[in-house]
UniProtKB/Swiss-Prot annotation:
This is Actin-57B. Its EC number is 3.6.4.-. GO terms for biological process: mitotic cytokinesis; ovarian fusome organization; regulation of synapse organization. Keywords: Acetylation, ATP-binding, Cytoplasm, Cytoskeleton, Hydrolase, Methylation, Nucleotide-binding, Oxidation. It comes from the Eukaryota.
Length: 376
């Protein structure tokens, strides 16, 4: 197979959104929700061409009549049949490519179970007949995208957050920490506190509206108590939002109370540490000699790190935890929503990477276990 002309595909499967495109591009061509929807009711209109399942944006637009399911929970694929539908949709409908003609780079969550990597490998070679594939860890790709090989990545998406310390390009598995607190939990929490305000959001379709409110209006306060006082004393922090039916709702302290849960998970009734402590704990699990390099390269990635104010707050919180002499730098690139994908695009287009692919021949010879030997 001549690698000169065939572009590799890069597919970043997140819990909330799937990002897909071609290696060498600077942004994904396709970004769509990782959703599979099935009709709640029997079709009555003859000849309407009703399907038994819908994927991505189409599922999203027909959400009123569908039950929506996310095949990826907390960053890890739990429903393989639906996942196959998502990949099929990615190749044939979004990118419009024949998967058997392109090498494909997939991404995985840190600490992904071994059986899962094998299953991904098997599906790519056996269902989609890929000529070659590779599985890369999401956080490592984000670090590449920021132009570094050493640093600690806080990757927070829709389903899960991880802190991943990376030294000279290798993730340090003993120091990776996972926090099951991410965008979807914040959306649920916003639904809850808006309900307390008298607005009712309950269905899966309404959850998507709340997600939009969250993405457009929420921010992280530098000082939570002070912000609460400001919100109580004036209406300066209030914003209005128009619902799809034309009703206008007003949202005040919910704007920063919602993402505050990242720093105070007790808001959600969770006993875990906030993201700032998780980053600190992760650094403390690393060798004392490399901590200085990690503190100076704290890289944020993923959609849940997109809140205005999050980097400044992180800087403040880590500064109060870390030794006073240490230099702390938070890197929050503007494109961090897609930095995993961008890192994959960079990696798959490097000439030095070309010998890293797992080829169909190697797979046929060794079986799915090959993924553990070639992708690390």
């Amino acid at each position: 197979m001549c690698d000169d002309e065939v572009a590799a595909l890069v597919v970043d499967n997140g819990s909330g959104m799937c990002k897909a495109g071609f290696a060498g591009d600077d942004a994904p061509r396709a970004v769509f929700p990782s959703i599979v929807g099935r009709p709640r009711h029997q079709g009555v209109m003859v000849g309407m061409g009703q399907k038994d399942s819908y994927v991505g944006d189409e599922a999203q637009s027909k959400r009123g009549i569908l039950t929506l399911k996310y095949p990826i929970e907390h960053g890890i694929i739990t429903n393989w049949d639906d996942m196959e539908k998502i990949w099929h949709h990615t190749f044939y409908n979004e990118l419009r490519v024949a998967p058997e003609e392109h090498p494909v780079l997939l991404t995985e969550a840190p600490l992904n179970p071994k059986a899962n990597r094998e299953k991904m490998t098997q599906i790519m070679f056996e269902t989609f007949n890929s000529p070659a594939m590779y599985v890369a860890i999401q956080a490592v790709l984000s670090l590449y995208a920021s132009g570094r090989t050493t640093g600690i990545v806080l990757d927070s998406g829709d389903g899960v957050s991880h802190t991943v310390p990376i030294y000279e390009g290798y993730a340090l598995p003993h120091a990776i920490l996972r926090l099951d607190l991410a965008g979807r939990d914040l959306t649920d929490y916003l639904m809850k506190i808006l309900t307390e305000r008298g607005y009712s959001f309950t269905t899966t379709a309404e959850r998507e509206i709340v997600r939009d409110i969250k993405e457009k209006l929420c921010y992280v306060a530098l000082d939570f108590e002070q912000e609460m006082a400001t919100a109580a004393a004036s209406t300066s922090l209030e914003k209005s939002y128009e619902l799809p039916d034309g009703q206008v709702i007003t949202i005040g302290n919910e704007r920063f109370r919602c993402p505050e849960s990242l720093f105070q998970p007790s808001f959600l009734g969770m006993e875990s540490c906030g993201i700032h402590e998780t980053v600190y704990n992760s650094i403390m699990k690393c060798d004392v000699d490399i901590r200085k390099d990690l503190y100076a390269n704290i890289v944020m990635s993923g959609g849940t790190t997109m809140y205005p104010g999050i980097a400044d707050r992180m800087q403040k919180e880590i500064t109060s935890l870390a030794p006073s002499t240490i230099k702390i730098k938070i890197i929050a690139p503007p494109e961090r929503k897609y930095s995993v994908w961008i890192g994959g695009s960079i990696l798959a287009s490097l000439s030095t990477f070309q010998q890293m692919w797992i080829s169909k021949e190697e797979y046929d010879e060794s079986g799915p276990g090959i993924v553990h030997r070639k992708c690390f």
